[in-house]
């Protein structure tokens, strides 16, 4: 039998190789940013690293079906719901950031002071492309692999740490790098919750959320206020939304779980388990019917045995009375013959009585679960109980006939002797 489950060693090796290739390519691709002549806030060349790493891992490692399970492009109702959330959550973060700028900095600038000559449409297209190539590698490929051995929450933590290392910005000081790490980790945790239980349909949700977030950053960074203040606002706002969204999601799922369990424990009328009680009542009724049938069979067996005994006595009396009208010698010979017949009849009647009792006992120990079996057993028992009575009558007639023939023969012999 073929086992399609990915092994623990390959699981770990896939994650390790993906991360190493991604980090190595991000370092090598930095030099190509100036070559292509595109500003870094429009499109980062280093963002191609996760896409290339995912393609290499798919080609190198086996279990292609498992690796490609997170790359489904179909649409479902849940995907549409998460797409709406992927647009709403960045808007909430943007509102919190703008409020923070107004409260703590007294103003905010909608665009950076440099690069204003670039059309907004070019920036939007560039951010969509960046979001697609990054999320293809990290969410559609890597998180799908990690979730084969972990649940979604812990898989999001692992992928979030790797994504934060990949997106680390050490251009400024340590404090800036720390807030940037907080921002990217919170960003990744929100994305992990958004793509939860979408059955591999992750690319649309991840791309939409990523592009919305990165596109919104250009409205909050201000050269006059400083990059440190901007990254603080972005990081804290994203962290607040991440905690709120994930916490609310856990609460809703917990309530749904408790409600479902309570509904299963407190069964209402006409529920799907009512047939259990019906079966118990049916079995109880069948048991009572079987017990009553057994008692009737036992009574019939006893009555049959008594009838056989009475028939035996009648036969003996009849056979004994008929020879008494003849002479002494003839009576002695006839009586001797009848005694022999009676003894054999007594043995046969004893066997018949034993069979009747055994039939009654077999009915008593017969299975009681099936109505058809009970009916067939009752018919067989009645038939077996009727057979001894019929046989008794036939046997009695046979004995009387034999006795009459013997008497006639004896009379003929006596008349011949007298002559």
Curated annotation (Swiss-Prot):
Keyword Transmembrane helix belongs to the record? yes
UniProt keyword terms in alphabetical order: Cell membrane, Cell wall, Membrane, Secreted, Transmembrane, Transmembrane helix
Q: How does it sit in the membrane?
A: Multi-pass membrane protein
- Please give the function described in this protein's UniProt entry: Involved in bacterial cell envelope homeostasis. Regulates peptidoglycan processing by N-acetylglucosaminidase SagB, perhaps acting as a scaffold protein. Pleiotropic regulator of gene expression, probably acting via interactions with multiple two-component systems. Plays a role in the abundant deposition of the immunoglobulin G-binding protein A (spa) at the cross-wall, a subcellular structure that initially arises from cytokinesis.
Family label: Belongs to the LyrA family.
Subunit field text? Interacts with N-acetylglucosaminidase SagB; interaction is direct and facilitates peptidoglycan processing. Interacts (via N-terminal region including transmembrane domains) with sensor protein kinase WalK (via N-terminal region including transmembrane domains). Interacts (via N-terminal region including transmembrane domains) with sensor protein kinase SaeS. Interacts with other histidine kinases, perhaps via their transmembrane domains.
**The protein's name in its UniProt record:** Lysostaphin resistance protein A
Gene (UniProt): lyrA
């Amino acid at each position: 039998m073929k086992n399609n489950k990915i092994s623990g060693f390959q699981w770990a090796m896939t994650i390790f190789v993906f991360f190493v290739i991604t980090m190595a390519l991000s370092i090598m691709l930095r030099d190509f940013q100036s070559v292509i002549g595109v500003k870094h806030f429009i499109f980062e060349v280093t963002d191609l690293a996760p896409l290339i790493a995912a393609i290499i891992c798919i080609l190198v490692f086996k279990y292609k079906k498992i690796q490609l399970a997170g790359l489904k492009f179909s649409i479902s109702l849940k995907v549409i719901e998460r797409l709406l959330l992927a647009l709403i959550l960045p808007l909430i973060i943007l509102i919190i950031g703008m409020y923070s700028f107004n409260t703590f900095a007294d103003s905010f600038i909608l665009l950076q002071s440099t690069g204003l000559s670039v059309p907004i449409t070019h920036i939007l297209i560039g951010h969509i492309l960046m979001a697609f190539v990054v999320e293809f590698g990290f969410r559609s490929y890597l998180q799908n692999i990690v979730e084969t051995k972990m649940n979604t929450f812990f898989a999001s933590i692992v992928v979030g740490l790797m994504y934060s290392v990949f997106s680390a910005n050490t251009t400024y000081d340590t404090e800036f790098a720390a807030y940037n790490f907080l921002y990217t980790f919170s960003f990744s945790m929100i994305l992990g919750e958004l793509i939860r239980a979408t059955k591999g349909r992750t690319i649309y949700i991840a791309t939409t959320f990523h592009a919305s977030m990165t596109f919104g950053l250009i409205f909050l960074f201000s050269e006059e206020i400083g990059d440190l203040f901007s990254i603080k606002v972005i990081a804290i706002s994203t962290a607040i939304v991440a905690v709120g969204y994930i916490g609310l999601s856990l609460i809703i799922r917990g309530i749904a779980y408790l409600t479902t369990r309570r509904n299963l424990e407190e069964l209402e009328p006409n529920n799907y388990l009512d047939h259990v009680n019906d079966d118990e009542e049916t079995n109880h009724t069948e048991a009572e019917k079987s017990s009553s049938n057994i008692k009737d069979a036992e009574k019939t067996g006893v009555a049959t045995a008594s009838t056989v005994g009475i028939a035996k006595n009648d036969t003996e009396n009849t056979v004994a009375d008929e020879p008494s009208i003849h002479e002494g010698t003839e009576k002695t010979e006839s009586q001797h013959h009848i005694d022999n017949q009676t003894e054999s009849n007594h043995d046969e009647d004893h066997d018949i009585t034993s069979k009747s009792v055994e039939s009654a006992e077999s009915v008593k120990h017969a299975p009681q679960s099936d109505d058809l079996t009970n009916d067939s057993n009752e018919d067989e028992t009645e038939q077996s109980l009727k057979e001894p009575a019929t046989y008794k009558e036939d046997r009695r007639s046979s004995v009387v006939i034999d006795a009459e023939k013997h008497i006639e023969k004896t009379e003929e012999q006596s008349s011949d002797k007298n002559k």
